[in-house]
Amino acid sequence: MAKRQLNRRQNWRIEKIQGERAARAAKRESVTLETLEGGDLGPEQTGLVIAHFGVQVEVEAQEGEDVGKVFRCHLRANLPALVTGDRVVWRAGNQGIGVIVAQLPRTTELRRPDSRGQLKPVAANVDLIVIVFAPMPEPHANLIDRYLVAAEHAGIHPLLLLNKADLIDEQNAPALNALLAVYRTLGYPVLEVSAHQGDGMQSLQSQLDGHISVFVGQSGVGKSSLVNSLLPETDTRVGPLSEVSGQGTHTTTTARLFHFPRGGDLIDSPGIREFGLGHVSRADVEAGFIEFNDLIGTCRFRDCKHDREPGCALLKGLEDGRVQQQRMNSYRSIIASLPQDSY
């Protein structure tokens, strides 16, 4: 069923109601925080944000007698927006409640624009981004390349993961093999697994051990199933594919961090169909296509748009095979989606 279109007044009313609810929640949170800070709080200690629930977060103690225990914590008003994976300084209160007093510096930050175009952090301190796709819903190189550009821009190593490999058949195998060959040629690590049958899961686990990883990819590719296979004790819900669209129904409702037995962590984040790149510049996108590195800056014209200009190094690379047509199409699509002031 198509979504009902709302007029301007209806949208204003919805935003007004949501704003009033948020204000009431913030007031209740402020009262609770004042009560906590007016009571007995423990000493400052370091912690790890493992889940975020609106105005509260779950923090795992990283030191002291409570190490490994999880506390629901309130946030002081002067703190920046916290996300799963953040390292913080906090103080424990009574009955498993605590207060976060400071955010520690992040090594990396994965961000994307929200519905209003404002940058929103998704996860912090991640050093491996696992880009998940599957035979169904049909993978699109453009979406994979958007994730790769985001990973390169954030300084996070990517791993391409084809899940549901048991669904590969004679009909879809040629296109999938051609897709994977492009990324293998570029030097990106690529794994093929089946969370359902368990094939390749040990190889995936060895890639994840010792890293702080995040799974990204459109809904329906089996991210929740992968988490359940890697960490059977979790209760991540799995949703079916829509029979109409072939896309998945969203299941995970909040980003959560899980520990692996042999070390390393996994952040399972809500499924997203489109990963926006409105926060990057044209130069950032060009840097995100690693095969462009030796070509950018060698065009005849400094302001070359790599379209039809004579002496364009990228077009020459396309002719001699150093640049694949699939990747060039993705590059042009991403550039076309950027705001004009990003040029």
UniProtKB/Swiss-Prot annotation:
Compartment list: Cytoplasm
Family annotation (SUPFAM superfamilies): P-loop containing nucleoside triphosphate hydrolases
Named cofactor requirement(s): Zn(2+)
Free-text remark on how the cofactor is bound: Binds 1 zinc ion per subunit.
Pfam annotation, one family: RsgA_GTPase
Domain of life, source organism: Bacteria
PROSITE patterns membership: ENGC_GTPASE (PS50936), G_CP (PS51721)
GO biological process terms, semicolon-separated: ribosomal small subunit biogenesis
Entry GO CC: cytoplasm
Keyword annotations: Cytoplasm, GTP-binding, Hydrolase, Metal-binding, Nucleotide-binding, Ribosome biogenesis, RNA-binding, rRNA-binding, Zinc
Keyword Signal: no
Binding site for Zn(2+): 299, 304, 306, 312
Function: One of several proteins that assist in the late maturation steps of the functional core of the 30S ribosomal subunit. Helps release RbfA from mature subunits. May play a role in the assembly of ribosomal proteins into the subunit. Circularly permuted GTPase that catalyzes slow GTP hydrolysis, GTPase activity is stimulated by the 30S ribosomal subunit.
Subunit structure: Monomer. Associates with 30S ribosomal subunit, binds 16S rRNA.
Family per similarity comment: Belongs to the TRAFAC class YlqF/YawG GTPase family. RsgA subfamily.
NCBIfam families hit by this protein: PRK12288.1 (NF008931), ribosome small subunit-dependent GTPase A (TIGR00157)
HAMAP family xrefs: GTPase_RsgA (MF_01820)
Protein name according to UniProt: Small ribosomal subunit biogenesis GTPase RsgA
Organism in which the protein naturally occurs: Pseudomonas syringae pv. tomato (strain ATCC BAA-871 / DC3000)
